[in-house]
């Protein structure tokens, strides 16, 4: 039989070395310490029923068994040194059996100690965030204990739903009355108020914000560092806010609505308007200039901005309908870009409506096609053989001067065909007129009736001296009619224009020159008369 002695008598009977061995932590103490650290890290929740279980009679009985085993070992060491090894083996077997029974109770007793309760208070104190909400430590609970299957009231579905609603409600801001479109009153509510500094300074920074899920799942060490950073931010916010929790007002005008806070030379907080006024004028802005609505640049809201604070009041925003329709078209295009898969989600395979490039078009011969003309063949021949618009060289000008008069007349006609008409109304009334203008008709008329009716009396003796080449119409030329309503007639070309006329004798050449001189004088007089008629017509229209 084993005799039971008190633990104090057992300790007194041991030598000093054995007392030190007894004071060393045992396996139970180490296990209890490990469980305490695990609970402090959020692995398991502390419950009051564990404290009650530690004071049960079973726990007292287990402690008596452990003390009896220790007394048995001490008596065997004192009485029989020969049978010490045998008793140690028995003690080891007995201690192993007692450890299996008393391990949960000893751990419960160690957790119920005052030191454990102090650690529990510190742990619970760390779980409280600045928003006075207790952090749910059961989010990452992967307990390895048998009693961890019991549910915690804080982790119930109703409580979790309430916490989710609280988190979503704290971050949301009430709908404001900002008109938008560059007029800002700092309350928000328009589509462009999401990134407005005045709105953020006044409303958004003062709104309560709940901790995010990432912060709730952080480790204790990371939580400690985040709490320190949050405390620093809270200190800065409290320094820039008054007792009501809103940002401080301007020291000069008292406004709380500004896109940018400034400081004067004394370090006082002033608004943006007062700061700019002080910088430009060197004096503080008068209070009478304070306005409740500030003018800002009109914000261009992206097409897919559907999560802004003012998304619900988009009817009062200043965004054009074209932008709204473009955003709807973009969202519809993104929705229909991929066909739905079998499981209901979008299939990221081949797109249902692939974006194809426009068909290629060859513009190589666009500018090289010849222009088709509806004029007469003789006129086309003259225009095609006419010189270009560039300045002529010396050889070309010399050859033009030495050419026969008929050739020069034809070149004059072809050159004058590119001039704009003087009278657009008469030019439009001429059918099949091509590009010939009234100037060319005035300068190159060959109508005998017109010549006889407009011949000067002083030059009448020289009129019969005209050569046959002047009286006969040139091939491909137009005859002039004094009445602008009657169109000039085109004489048909009987021969090829590439064959030059035969050379003239000197006497005939002098006659041609004299006739040409008289013709030019008559044409100049006719042009003066036509100009006077047009001036009279313009005067009558005034």
From Swiss-Prot:
Q: Where is this chain's protein located in or outside the cell? A: Nucleus
One GO term under biological process is:
negative regulation of transcription by RNA polymerase II
Q: Where are the zinc fingers (GATA-type)?
A: 250-274
| Keyword Coiled coil applies | yes
Where do Basic and acidic residues bias regions lie? Answer: 44-63
Record's PROSITE patterns?
GATA_ZN_FINGER_1, GATA_ZN_FINGER_2
Q: Which GO terms describe its molecular function?
A: DNA-binding transcription factor activity, RNA polymerase II-specific; RNA polymerase II cis-regulatory region sequence-specific DNA binding; zinc ion binding
SUPFAM superfamilies from the UniProt entry: Glucocorticoid receptor-like (DNA-binding domain)
Q: Which sequence ranges form a coiled-coil region, renumbered to this chain?
A: 510-542
GO cellular component entries: nucleus
For whether the record's keyword set contains Nucleotide-binding, the answer is no
Domain of life of the native organism: Eukaryota
Q: Where is this region: Cystein-rich region (CRR)?
A: 178-196
Q: Where is this region: Disordered?
A: 1-172, 210-248, 289-408, 461-525
Keyword annotations for this protein, in alphabetical order, are: Coiled coil, Metal-binding, Nucleus, Transcription, Transcription regulation, Zinc, Zinc-finger
SMART domains reported in the protein's UniProt record: ZnF_GATA
The free-text function statement in the UniProt record for this protein reads: GATA-type transcription repressor that regulates iron acquisition genes through specific binding the GATA sequence elements of target promoters. SreA targets include genes encoding a number of key iron-regulated factors such as the siderophore biosynthesis genes. Is dispensable for growth on keratin substrates.
Q: What is known of its domains?
A: The conserved cystein-rich region (CRR) localized between the zinc fingers is also involved in DNA-binding and transcription repressor activity.
User: How is this protein named in the record?
Assistant: GATA-type transcription factor sreA
Source organism per entry reads: Arthroderma benhamiae (strain ATCC MYA-4681 / CBS 112371)
């Amino acid at each position: 039989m084993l005799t039971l002695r008190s633990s104090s008598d057992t300790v007194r009977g041991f030598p000093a070395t054995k007392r030190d061995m007894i004071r060393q932590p045992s396996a139970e103490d180490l296990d209890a310490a490990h469980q305490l650290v695990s609970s402090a890290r959020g692995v398991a929740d502390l419950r009051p029923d564990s404290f009650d279980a530690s004071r049960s009679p079973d726990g007292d009985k287990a402690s008596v068994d452990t003390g009896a085993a220790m007394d048995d070992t001490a008596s065997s060491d004192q009485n029989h040194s020969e049978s010490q090894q045998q008793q140690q083996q028995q003690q080891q077997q007995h201690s192993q059996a007692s450890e299996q029974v008393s391990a949960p109770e000893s751990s419960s007793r160690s957790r119920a100690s005052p030191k454990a309760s102090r650690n529990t208070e510190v742990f619970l104190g760390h779980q409280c965030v600045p928003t006075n909400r207790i952090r749910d430590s059961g989010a990452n609970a992967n307990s390895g204990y048998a009693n961890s299957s019991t549910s915690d009231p804080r982790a119930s579905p109703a409580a979790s739903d309430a916490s989710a609603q609280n988190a979503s409600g704290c971050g949301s801001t009430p709908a404001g009355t900002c008109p938008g479109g560059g007029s800002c009153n700092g309350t928000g509510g328009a589509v462009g108020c999401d990134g407005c500094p005045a709105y953020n300074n006044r409303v958004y920074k003062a709104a309560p914000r709940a901790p995010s899920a990432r912060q709730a799942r952080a480790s204790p060490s990371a939580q400690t560092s985040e709490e320190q950073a949050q405390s620093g931010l809270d200190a800065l916010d409290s320094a820039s806010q008054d007792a009501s929790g809103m940002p401080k007002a301007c020291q000069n005008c008292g406004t709380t609505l500004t896109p940018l806070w400034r400081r004067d030379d004394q370090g006082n907080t002033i608004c943006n308007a007062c700061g700019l006024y002080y910088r430009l004028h060197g004096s503080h802005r008068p209070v009478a200039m304070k306005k409740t609505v500030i003018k800002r640049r009109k914000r261009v809201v992206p097409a897919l901005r559907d999560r802004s604070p003012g998304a619900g009041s988009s009817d009062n925003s200043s965004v054009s309908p074209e932008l709204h329709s473009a955003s709807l078209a973009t969202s519809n295009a993104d929705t229909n870009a991929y066909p739905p898969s079998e499981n209901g989600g979008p299939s990221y395979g081949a797109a249902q409506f692939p974006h194809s490039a426009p068909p290629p078009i060859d513009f190589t011969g666009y500018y090289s096609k010849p222009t088709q003309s509806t004029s007469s063949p003789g006129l086309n021949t003259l225009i095609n053989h006419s010189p270009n618009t560039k300045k002529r060289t010396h050889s070309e000008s010399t050859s033009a001067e030495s050419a026969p008069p008929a050739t020069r007349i034809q070149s004059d006609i072809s050159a004058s065909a590119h001039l704009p008409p003087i009278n657009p109304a008469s030019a439009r009334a001429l059918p099949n007129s091509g590009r010939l203008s009234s100037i060319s008709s005035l300068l190159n008329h060959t109508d005998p009736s017109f010549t006889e009716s407009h011949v000067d009396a002083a030059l009448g003796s020289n009129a019969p001296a005209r050569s046959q080449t002047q009286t006969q119409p040139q091939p491909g030329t137009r005859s002039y009619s004094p009445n602008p309503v009657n169109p000039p007639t085109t004489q048909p070309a009987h021969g090829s224009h590439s064959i030059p006329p035969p050379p003239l004798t000197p006497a005939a050449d002098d006659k041609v020159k004299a006739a040409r001189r008289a013709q030019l004088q008559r044409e100049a007089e006719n042009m003066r008369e036509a100009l006077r008629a047009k001036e009279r017509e313009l005067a009558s229209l005034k």
